[in-house]
C-alpha cells in the first residue's frame, strides 16, 4: 500500500501491519516530526509538533485526518538547539529549548546535528499564547542557566513541570515553575537525587530526569533515568517529598527509566526504558506494568514481550534491520480532553520495530495484538545523521479522542494511523 498527499515529497510504504490501517501521510516539507501536542479551537483540530534536524515548529490542521494540512511553520533558535518538545493546554504552548547532544551522548553530538564551530545554544522553555491557534505569540522565556529542558509537563493552570538542566548540575532535575505571570516565570522548587550537583561526588551511574514529570493530582511521577522510577508528593509545591523509588538495576540503556505513567483508576503505572545504542548494544530494555496499590512499594507485575517480525517481514529479527531497536514513547494524554485516555490498549513506538499495540487487560499477561511497521525510508531528510543505516526509527506517538494515531520518525514526516482491532474497553 502507498499513500501520498499533494503536499508529500515521498510516499510511505507499509511493510507490516496488523489491526492498524494507514490513514494519511504528510512529509511536512521534509521536516521529521517528533514530540506532538494538540488543541481543538472552534471545531478545528490542531496538531503542534517540533522536529528532528530542523529548528522550529509546525502546526498541522488534522480536522480531517485523512487530509492533514500544514497551516503554519515558524523558526526557532538556529544554532545547536533542539526544539523537539512541545506541550499545549488552555491556550498556552510550552516549547523546550535544549543544547544538542547533552551529557548523555556528548561523543556523538555531531551526529545529532551539533556544530562544534559555533559552541553556543539557546536553553530553557518558551511560553506562547496560542488562543489564536495559527498566531503563536511569545509571552515569556524561562532560563535554566544550563543545557536547557527536555521533556516537560503542562496541563494548564499555574505551574509547568520541567526536566531541566539547571546551573550547577550535571544532568536534568525536577523543577516547578510558576507561569501565572508568563512574562516573568518564577521557579517555585526543585528536586534532585544524590550525585547530580557538581559540588558533590558523582555517582557511578549518573541519573538524569528524562521526563515528563507527569502530574496526577498531588503526585509527580518522574522517569529519573538511572535513578529509576520516582514518585513525589507535591501537595506542597514548594517542598516536593519522596514517596517511593523503584530501581531497574542494570536493565536498560544508559538512559535508564524513560517514562513513568500512572494509570490511576487501575492503581497501576507503566515504566519504560529507551533504546539508545544502535545494533542492539544496550543492556536489555524493557516496558513493565507496575502495581501501585501501595504507592510506597511499587512492584513490577510483568514485562511486555519483545516484538517479533511477522511473516510479512524480510528479516527474522528487528535487531537485524540496523538502527535502534527497543522501546521509546507511549501515548500520554496529559489530562487533555482532545486526547485519548490510556485504557486497556497500550500504544508504544519501538524504533526499527515501528508501532506496537498491547492488550494489558491482564497486567500479569500482556500480549501484543497489533503493529504497524513502514518500509525503509527512501531518502535521508538531513545530512548523514543518525541512524547510521537508513531504516525506520519510530519515535513519538499521540492519539486523539477520535482514535486517530499520529507518529513520527527521524526520516519520515507525519504518519496518521487508526486501530482496527477489537474494542478492549477501559479508555
Locate the predicted segments by residue.
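Feature marking well-ordered beta-strand scaffolds used for ligand recognition
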Residues: 1-427
Amino acid at each position: 500500500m502507498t499513500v501520498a498527499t499533494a503536499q508529500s515529497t515521498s510516499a510511505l510504504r507499509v511493510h507490516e501491519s496488523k489491526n492498524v490501517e494507514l490513514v494519511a501521510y504528510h512529509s511536512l516539507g521534509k521536516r521529521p516530526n517528533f514530540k506532538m501536542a494538540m488543541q481543538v479551537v472552534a471545531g478545528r483540530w490542531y496538531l503542534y509538533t517540533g522536529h528532528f534536524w530542523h529548528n522550529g515548529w509546525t502546526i498541522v490542521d488534522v480536522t480531517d485526518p485523512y487530509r492533514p494540512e500544514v497551516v503554519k511553520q515558524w523558526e526557532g533558535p538556529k544554532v545547536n538547539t533542539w526544539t523537539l518538545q512541545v506541550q499545549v493546554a488552555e491556550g498556552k504552548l510550552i516549547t523546550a529549548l535544549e543544547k544538542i547532544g547533552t551529557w548523555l551522548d556528548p561523543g556523538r553530538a555531531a551526529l545529532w546535528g551539533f556544530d562544534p564551530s559555533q559552541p553556543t545554544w539557546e536553553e530553557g522553555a518558551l511560553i506562547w499564547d496560542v488562543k489564536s491557534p495559527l498566531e503563536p505569540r511569545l509571552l515569556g522565556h524561562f532560563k535554566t542557566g544550563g543545557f536547557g529542558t527536555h521533556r516537560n509537563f503542562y496541563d494548564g493552570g499555574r505551574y509547568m513541570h520541567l526536566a531541566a538542566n539547571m546551573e550547577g548540575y550535571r544532568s536534568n532535575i525536577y523543577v516547578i515553575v510558576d507561569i501565572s505571570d508568563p512574562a516573568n516565570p518564577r521557579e517555585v522548587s526543585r528536586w534532585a537525587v544524590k550525585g547530580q550537583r557538581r559540588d558533590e561526588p558523582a555517582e557511578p551511574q549518573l541519573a538524569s530526569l528524562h521526563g515528563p514529570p507527569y502530574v496526577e493530582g498531588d503526585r509527580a511521577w518522574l522517569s529519573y533515568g538511572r535513578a529509576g522510577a520516582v514518585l513525589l508528593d507535591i501537595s506542597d509545591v514548594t517542598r516536593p517529598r519522596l514517596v517511593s523509588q523503584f530501581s531497574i538495576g542494570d536493565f536498560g540503556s544508559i538512559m535508564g527509566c524513560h517514562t513513568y505513567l500512572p494509570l490511576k483508576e487501575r492503581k497501576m503505572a507503566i515504566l519504560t526504558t529507551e533504546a539508545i545504542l544502535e545494533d542492539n548494544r544496550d543492556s536489555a530494555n524493557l516496558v513493565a506494568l507496575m502495581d501501585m496499590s501501595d504507592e510506597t512499594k511499587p512492584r513490577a507485575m510483568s514485562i511486555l514481550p519483545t516484538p517479533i517480525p511477522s511473516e510479512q517481514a524480510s528479516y527474522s529479527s528487528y535487531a537485524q534491520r540496523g538502527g535502534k531497536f527497543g522501546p521509546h514513547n507511549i501515548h500520554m494524554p496529559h489530562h487533555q480532553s482532545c486526547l485519548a485516555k490510556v485504557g486497556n490498549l497500550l500504544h508504544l513506538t519501538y524504533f526499527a520495530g515501528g508501532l506496537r499495540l498491547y492488550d494489558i487487560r491482564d497486567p500479569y499477561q500482556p500480549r501484543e495484538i497489533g503493529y504497524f511497521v513502514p518500509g525503509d525510508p527512501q531518502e535521508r531528510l538531513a545530512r548523514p545523521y543518525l541512524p547510521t543505516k537508513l531504516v525506520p526509527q519510530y519515535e513519538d506517538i499521540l492519539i486523539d479522542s477520535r482514535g486517530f494515531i499520529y507518529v513520527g520518525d527521524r526520516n519520515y514526516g507525519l504518519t496518521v494511523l487508526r486501530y482496527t482491532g477489537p474494542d478492549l474497553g477501559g479508555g
